[in-house]
Amino acid sequence: MPARMHYTVLEPSSTERVAIRGLEYNVRRWGPADAPKVFLLHGWMDTSATFQFVVDALRHDWQLIAPDWRGYGETTWLHRPYWFPDYYADLEALLAHYAPAGPVRLVGHSMGANIAGIYAGLRPQRVARLAMLDFIGLKAPADVDAPQQLGRWLDAQL
C-alpha cells in the first residue's frame, strides 16, 4: 500500500462575500494586499480552493484572488438553468469590484480558462496577461457577428 501523502497549507485563504449581479459570491484571497493582483478562475466541478498549491508557491509576490463561480462552492446557487455568458458578466463585475482601473492578470483552469479567454477577446483592454490551463476551446460560431453580439450583451449588463 502506498504511503499517504500529507500536504501542509502554507497560507490559508481569507474569504469574503461580495454582491455580484444579484448573487452572493464567495471569494478567497491570499498574499499581500499591496502586491500586484492575479485572478485565479477555477474549472468545472471545482472551487477556488483548488488553487491552494499554486498559492503557496506565489503568495509572497502576488495578491491572489479566486472566486467560486455561480453554482460552485460557497457562492449562491441558482434554482434555474445556468447560462454560460453570465460567467463573463460575473467576471466583469468581479474585476470592477477588485480592480476597477487598468488591465488585470487572469489565470484560468478548464471552464475558468474558457471564461477568461472569451472575456479577454471581448475586453482586450482589461487583460494584461492571460494563462489558460487544461481547456477545450469553444466551437467557432456560425454567425460571424457573434463576438460583437456578445460584447453588446456584456455592455448592457453594466
Predicted segments, located by residue:
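Alpha/beta-hydrolase fold catalytic core
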Residues: 1-38, 59-63, 99-102, 128, ...
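Active-site loop/oxyanion-hole signature of alpha/beta-hydrolase fold enzymes
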Residues: 18-28, 66-111, 115
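Conserved HGGG/HGGXW glycine-rich cap/lid loop of the alpha/beta-hydrolase fold
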Residues: 26-77
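Conserved acidic functional residues
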Residues: 43-46, 90, 133-134
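Active-site micro-motifs of SAM-dependent methyltransferase domains
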Residues: 46, 71, 113, 137-138
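A conserved amphipathic alpha-helix that caps or lines the catalytic cleft of carbohydrate-
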Residues: 55, 95, 119-120
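Glycine-rich, phosphate-binding/catalytic loops in enzymes
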Residues: 55-58, 81-84, 123-124, 146-150
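Flexible "cap/lid" loop of the alpha/beta hydrolase fold
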Residues: 117-122, 128-158
